[in-house]
């Protein structure tokens, strides 16, 4: 029951985050900048017959930020505000979400991923670092699979390879189903139809074979919280399936850590992006550190 109440609380929080992010997430400066509705930073382009809205901020190496299911650029306010001082930030409303157009066809993670690749091509940047949260974490991994030449480093927060019981506990799957049923009742409006399509996707997708992770050869940081929606066992399996990966689990946090504790979330990403990737050779490096410790104590 406690776990179910926690999941229900998450649902309420997620609705508030998606609805209010431009005003209520990030720093005071982020609240003052209308991320997701900034005419000075926004533009559109067309890919696969769909008009897609994006915004860019800052200068430096390109960093692509990818929002979660039903979200928009506005939900990335705390991340845009933090990283724009160091990077050229690129953020896009996924098809059927935010200010991007309705695709008038079923939505898939592969289509959204190909939209991101097209945006990179459109802006003539790349390869880029990419940070994705939730659905965006799935798209970040798929960029590494489908468009490996367009990415340098990947940060994937709480991704899943499929919507099955290995990824989600039964009460979480029930939550997704109830959210779909609620959106189904609103399908008489254009926005309601969009929401039903996007939320309903979570019940059927993604469908990424675990063996496909071996194709993601760029350095990848896999993130999750210890009270996440995605089962930790599933997240760890994703980490282990990636050939050049690091893993970080946020203690006493939830799926909403980018909004609840953006300082910790952003700092973890900062370190990964700024530090050259190094694969740890477990036994030799552990023993080397141990010898240094013992030498220091002997002095």
Segments predicted by a language model, with ranges:
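C-terminal motif of bacterial Sec signal peptides marking the signal peptidase cleavage site
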Residues: 18-19
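Conserved HGGG/HGGXW glycine-rich cap/lid loop of the alpha/beta-hydrolase fold
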Residues: 50-99
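Active-site loop/oxyanion-hole signature of alpha/beta-hydrolase fold enzymes
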Residues: 91-131
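Conserved hydrolase catalytic core segment
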Residues: 126-164
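Active-site nucleophile elbow and catalytic-triad environment of alpha/beta-hydrolase enzymes
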Residues: 196-212, 226-230
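Short beta-strand/loop motif that positions the catalytic acidic residue
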Residues: 216, 222-224
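Conserved loop-alpha-helix segment in the C-terminal half of the alpha/beta-hydrolase fold
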Residues: 224-253, 296-299
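Catalytic active-site module of serine/aspartate enzymes centered on a nucleophile-bearing elbow/loop
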Residues: 251-299
């Amino acid at each position: 029951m406690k776990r179910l109440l926690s999941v229900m609380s998450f649902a309420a929080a997620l609705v508030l985050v998606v609805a209010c992010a431009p005003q209520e997430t990030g720093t005071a400066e982020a609240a003052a900048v209308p991320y997701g509705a900034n005419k000075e930073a926004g533009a559109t382009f067309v890919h696969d017959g769909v008009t897609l809205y994006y915004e860019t901020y800052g200068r430096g190496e390109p960093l692509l930020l990818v929002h979660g299911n039903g979200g928009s650029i506005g939900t990335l306010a705390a991340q845009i505000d933090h990283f724009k001082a160091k990077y050229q930030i690129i953020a896009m409303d996924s098809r059927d979400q935010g200010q991007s157009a309705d695709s008038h066809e079923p939505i898939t993670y592969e289509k959204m991923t190909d939209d991101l690749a097209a945006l990179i091509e459109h802006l003539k940047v790349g390869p880029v670092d990419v940070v994705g949260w939730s659905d965006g974490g799935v798209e970040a991994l798929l960029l590494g699979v489908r468009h490996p030449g367009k990415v340098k480093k990947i940060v994937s927060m709480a991704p899943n390879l499929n919507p099955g019981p290995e990824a989600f506990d039964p009460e979480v799957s029930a939550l997704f189903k109830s959210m779909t049923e609620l959106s189904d009742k609103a399908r008489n409006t254009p926005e309601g139809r969009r929401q039903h399509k996007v939320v309903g996707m979570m019940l059927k997708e993604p469908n990424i074979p675990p063996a496909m992770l071996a194709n993601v050869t760029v350095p990848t940081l896999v993130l999750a919280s210890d009270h996440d929606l995605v089962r930790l066992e599933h997240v760890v399996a994703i980490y282990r399936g990636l050939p050049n990966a690091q893993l970080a689990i946020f203690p006493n946090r939830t799926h909403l850590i980018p909004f609840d504790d953006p300082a910790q979330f952003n700092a973890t990403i900062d370190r990964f992006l700024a530090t050259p990737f190094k694969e740890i050779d477990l036994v030799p490096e552990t023993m080397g550190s141990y010898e240094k410790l013992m030498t220091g104590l002997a002095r």
